[in-house]
Amino acid sequence: SDGRNEAANDEASDVIELALKGCCSNPVCHLEHPNACGRRR
């Protein structure tokens, strides 16, 4: 393992996290992905 795949996975996770942050501010998307948004009330 040369570490390249790990870096790519970290990068993908960051992109997904950013997308989910946007999703969490969208009520429809938030309802579809409550786990990703942490169900804060």
Swiss-Prot record:
Proregion residues excised on maturation: 1-21
Record localization: Secreted
Any one GO molecular-function label of the UniProt entry: acetylcholine receptor inhibitor activity
Gene Ontology CC, one term: extracellular region
Chain spans, region Ser-Xaa-Pro motif, crucial for potent interaction with nAChR: 25-27
Principal cellular location given in the protein's record: secreted
Tissue distribution: Expressed by the venom duct.
Cystine crosslinks: C23-C29, C24-C37
Keywords: Acetylcholine receptor inhibiting toxin, Amidation, Disulfide bond, Ion channel impairing toxin, Neurotoxin, Postsynaptic neurotoxin, Secreted, Toxin
Keyword Disulfide bond: yes
Domain notes: The cysteine framework is I (CC-C-C). Alpha4/7 pattern.
Entry similarity comment: Belongs to the conotoxin A superfamily.
General function of this protein: Alpha-conotoxins act on postsynaptic membranes, they bind to the nicotinic acetylcholine receptors (nAChR) and thus inhibit them. This toxin blocks rat neuronal nAChR alpha-3-beta-2/CHRNA3-CHRNB2 (IC(50)=128.9 nM) and alpha-7/CHRNA7 (IC(50)=1511 nM). In vivo, intramuscular injection into zebrafish does not produce any effect on the locomotion of zebrafish.
Additional notes on this entry: Negative results: this toxin does not show effect on neuronal nAChR alpha-4-beta-2/CHRNA4-CHRNB2 and on muscular alpha-1-beta-1-gamma-delta (CHRNA1-CHRNB1-CHRNG-CHRND) (when tested at 10 uM).
Entry protein name: Alpha-conotoxin CIB
Taxonomic source organism: Conus catus
